UniProtKB/Swiss-Prot annotation:
Biological role stated in the UniProt entry: Cell wall formation.
GO biological process: cell division; cell wall organization; peptidoglycan biosynthetic process; regulation of cell shape
Molecular function GO terms recorded: ATP binding; UDP-N-acetylmuramate-L-alanine ligase activity
UniProt keywords, alphabetically: ATP-binding, Cell cycle, Cell division, Cell shape, Cell wall biogenesis/degradation, Cytoplasm, Ligase, Nucleotide-binding, Peptidoglycan synthesis
Protein name: UDP-N-acetylmuramate--L-alanine ligase
Main localisation: cytoplasm
Chain positions recorded as ATP binding sites: G112, T113, H114, G115, K116, T117, T118
Length: 461
């Protein structure tokens, strides 16, 4: 590729998925340029590596580019995209560039509605500890590397595979992982679960006949899909029918202890430096990948015990002063009812006897509409709920399915400990009266609520 392509331009380079691919391209020796509307830590990191980044969208930015990479968030009438098409500069989706990087390596693609970022991070950490030195591209910052991407020296490339727009069908990996299948991003699938399932089947069939698919047997939707697959399958889970399963699972503070049983290996123990039974499943997926590649049990144990976590995935910041109250802050990206329930359940186990205050920003009106009853059910597990306005992500408001509607539905079901705030500034003004010493404050959502968590962990007031 380097003989034909010298400069790669990324439109919307500040997005975590785009930035990871851009970083790998920089490290491969390509000239990387890009544009975005605002600066953020990810963009500053890329600039420090040599990327040429502009903070507006203008046709002049792409004049010297050999290819333009876009994410699904970029409008078709973007001036850079329009100029590139008029100039016959190839315009390709982010996943197509990832596929090109994967084509040159042994690709490991990790998909699923929930848990794929953590699973990709765990697999990357284990393979690195095992001496395989993989390249990885992740949808979140792997804390021990302080980055969401890294160019390794080996043939292995581990990547998070995105089903939200079905773009994972661009990939042709040697090994695929599916953590679970749940209804989300249903606008991509015409609101029909059968279309979603068929797309996951096609994703697995992107494997060569000698490839392997690793799937969670505990997930009912995956169980239903298995008879439709015609590739080698390895299963993991808590179920006795799993090829690789966890037993003797014990929650201790912010870590999980369990044993791993595999059909062809002696049982071994694991300490995972992450809380929650859902993270045991994520770890099992990563362990299965590692065992397929002959990584030693000792390397698996060491990597999981020392795992530094992922940005905004149950990131815990103890002893923070918020509103002059001493609290524990937990920052999490979860924005689907299943993720809310898993995170709140994990917090209950990690912080027994403490009051859980959930600050939640719903993400997209369409998701709130499609999963309205599920959100109402999941949000009731908090002791105190603070709902921010829905983060629209470019969607037009739907009044019947906004935060006020969620709040009203919860109160009709008897959950009175909740309130709606219209802005993060208003929330900051209310913290002194809302919070108590020793509270656990969970900040959750996929929108700009992450900035609130960053502000709270960086400054006491």
């Amino acid at each position: 590729m380097k003989d034909q392509v010298k400069q790669i331009h990324f439109v919307g380079i500040g997005g975590v998925g785009m930035a990871g691919i851009a970083e790998v391209c920089l490290n491969l020796g390509f000239t990387v340029s890009g544009s975005d509307l605002k600066e953020n830590p990810t963009v500053r990191h890329l600039i420090s590596l040599g990327a040429l980044i502009q903070f507006n969208h203008d046709a002049s930015h792409v004049k010297n580019s050999d290819v333009v990479v876009v994410s699904t968030a970029i409008a078709k009438d973007n001036p850079e995209v329009c100029f590139a098409k008029e100039s016959r500069i190839p315009v390709i989706p982010r996943a197509a560039m990832l596929a090109e990087l994967m084509r040159m390596r042994f690709g490991i693609a990790i998909a699923g509605t929930h848990g794929k970022t953590t699973t990709t991070s765990l697999a990357s950490a284990i393979l690195t500890e095992g001496g395989l030195d993989p390249t990885f591209v992740i949808g979140g910052k792997l804390n021990q590397f302080d980055s969401n991407a890294r160019l390794g020296s080996s043939q292995y490339l581990i990547a998070e595979a995105d089903e939200s727009d079905a773009s994972f069908l661009h990939l042709s990996p040697m090994m695929s992982v599916v953590t679970n299948i749940d209804e989300d991003h249903m606008e991509t699938y015409q609101g029909d679960y059968a279309n979603l399932e068929q797309t996951f089947i096609e994703f697995i069939h992107r494997l060569p006949f000698y490839g392997v698919a690793i799937v969670c047997i505990d997930d009912q939707n995956i169980q239903n899909m298995l008879p439709k697959l015609s590739r080698k399958i390895r299963t993991y889970g808590f179920s006795e029918s799993a090829d690789i399963r966890a037993t003797e699972v014990l929650h201790q503070g912010l870590s999980m202890h369990f044993n791993v049983k595999a059909n062809d290996l002696p049982e071994f123990s694991v300490v995972l430096n992450q809380p929650g039974k859902h993270n045991v499943l994520n770890a099992l997926a990563a362990i299965t990948v590692a065992l397929e590649l002959d990584v030693s049990i000792e390397s698996i144990q060491k990597a999981l015990a020392g795992f530094g976590g992922v940005g905004r995935r149950f990131e815990v910041y103890p002893s923070r002063s918020i509103g002059h109250k001493n609290v524990t802050l937990v920052d999490d990206y979860g924005h689907h009812p299943t993720e809310l329930e898993a995170t709140l359940s994990t917090a209950r186990m990690a912080f027994p006897e403490k009051r859980l205050v959930l600050v939640f920003q719903p993400h997209r009106y369409s998701r709130t509409r499609d999963l309205f009853d599920e959100f109402v059910q999941a949000l009731q597990h908090a002791d105190l709920l603070v709902l921010l306005d829905v983060y629209p992500a470019g969607e037009a408001p739907i009044a019947a399915f906004d935060s006020k509607a969620l709040l009203q539905a919860m109160r009709l079901r008897g959950h009175k400990e909740n309130l709606h705030v219209e802005s993060q500034q208003q929330l900051n003004e209310l913290t002194e009266t809302l919070l108590l010493d020793d509270d656990v404050v969970l900040v959750m959502g996929a929108g700009d609520v992450g900035q609130l968590a960053r502000d709270w962990k960086q400054q006491a007031y």
